[in-house]
């Protein structure tokens, strides 16, 4: 690749680093083209799986202001740029690596933090935003039904207390 071509690739990669909500670095040695295509399909529209030279990735990451990825950029590397839910992408990578041992997740970068391979696995174990919202909605629904029961129970208790006092006064009289 000639210098102008490399500069164009670096500019494109830099833009991808800047726009991504997260970045995962993988080693793809041993994956076939159909397996890589399958991975790209599973990752979905909000991600891109990019193969380039490590030097170009390093330069682009540095220009995008991302430090700490150099140690992970050794050997054949591909970068997953995530525009959407980066936890969901981590889960897809984890699951794909379970069935395709050739894929190795080296680490990543999300929310201003660099993660090693173990950190990327921990991200995959987190619940996704929709799952957390569903849990919150369920908790709120339960709390609201308890509150409704409580609000209905208070007037009933007051009425029973008044009836008991009236009965007591009638017996005393």
From Swiss-Prot:
Q: Which CDD domains match?
A: Ribosomal_L10
Q: Amino-acid biosynthesis: present as a keyword of the record?
A: no
Q: Name one Pfam family in it.
A: Ribosomal_L10
- Sorted alphabetically, which PROSITE patterns does this protein's record hold? RIBOSOMAL_L10
Q: List GO BP terms, alphabetically.
A: translation
Offer a single GO CC term for the protein: large ribosomal subunit
What keyword terms does UniProt attach to this protein?
Ribonucleoprotein, Ribosomal protein, RNA-binding, rRNA-binding
GO molecular-function annotation terms?
A: large ribosomal subunit rRNA binding; structural constituent of ribosome
* Subunit structure as annotated in this protein's UniProt entry: Part of the ribosomal stalk of the 50S ribosomal subunit. The N-terminus interacts with L11 and the large rRNA to form the base of the stalk. The C-terminus forms an elongated spine to which L12 dimers bind in a sequential fashion forming a multimeric L10(L12)X complex.
User: Family, per the entry?
Assistant: Belongs to the universal ribosomal protein uL10 family.
Q: What does this chain do?
A: Forms part of the ribosomal stalk, playing a central role in the interaction of the ribosome with GTP-bound translation factors.
Q: What is this protein called?
A: Large ribosomal subunit protein uL10
Identify the species of origin.
Bifidobacterium animalis subsp. lactis (strain AD011)
């Amino acid at each position: 690749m000639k210098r102008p071509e490399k500069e164009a690739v670096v500019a494109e990669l830099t833009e991808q680093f800047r726009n991504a909500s997260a970045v995962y670095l993988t080693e793809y040695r041993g994956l076939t083209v159909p397996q890589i295509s399958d991975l790209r399909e599973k990752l979905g529209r909000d991600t891109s799986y990019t193969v380039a030279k490590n030097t170009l990735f390093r330069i682009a990451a540095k220009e995008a202001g991302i430090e700490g990825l150099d140690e992970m950029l050794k050997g054949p590397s591909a970068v997953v740029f995530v525009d959407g839910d980066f936890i969901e992408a981590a889960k897809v990578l984890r699951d794909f690596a379970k069935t395709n041992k050739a894929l190795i997740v080296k680490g990543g970068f999300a929310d201003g933090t660099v993660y090693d391979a173990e950190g990327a696995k921990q991200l995959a174990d987190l619940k996704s935003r929709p799952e957390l919202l569903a849990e919150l909605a369920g908790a709120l629904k339960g709390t609201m039904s308890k509150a409704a029961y409580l609000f209905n129970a208070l007037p009933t208790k007051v009425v029973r207390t008044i009836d008991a006092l009236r009965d007591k006064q009638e017996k005393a009289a």
